[in-house]
């Protein structure tokens, strides 16, 4: 009697995951910096009545790219939906996105052995 063919799960692609992690890390820091700049712009507008309107536009586009890169990483490392949403929302709080990036990077590198290159 022959065994039925069962589909195999695709192998984990370390290089794609490493690239996704790098993109996420860069965008988490970039989003955090632009969010701090946006907070400065809001204080400057409300307290000193300065008009700096381009920072919010740049931050919006940077956050959009952050969402894409974080979602890409979530798919690559198979995060559950709750964790993915938490990481995405962390990018909306000043400094929290950078803190979450640190812990998520540490977790992904530990879980998948991305500390050393695979050959």
Swiss-Prot record:
Pfam families: DUF3817. It is found in: Cell membrane. The keyword Cell membrane applies. Its main location: membrane. The chain crosses the membrane at residues 28-48, 55-75, 80-100. Keywords: Cell membrane, Membrane, Transmembrane, Transmembrane helix. GO terms for cellular component: plasma membrane. To M.tuberculosis Rv1342c. NCBIfam families: integ_memb_HG. This is Uncharacterized protein ML1176.
């Amino acid at each position: 009697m022959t065994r039925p063919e069962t589909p195999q799960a695709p192998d984990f692609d370390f290089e794609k995951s490493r690239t996704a992690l790098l993109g996420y890390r860069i965008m988490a820091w970039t989003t955090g910096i632009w969010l701090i700049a946006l907070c400065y712009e809001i204080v400057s507008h409300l307290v000193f009545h300065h008009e700096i309107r381009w920072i919010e536009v740049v931050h919006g586009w940077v956050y959009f790219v952050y969402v894409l890169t974080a979602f890409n990483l979530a798919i690559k490392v198979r995060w559950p939906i709750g964790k993915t949403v938490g990481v995405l929302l962390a990018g909306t709080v000043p400094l929290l996105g950078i803190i979450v990036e640190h812990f998520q990077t540490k977790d992904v590198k530990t879980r998948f052995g991305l500390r050393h290159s695979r050959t």
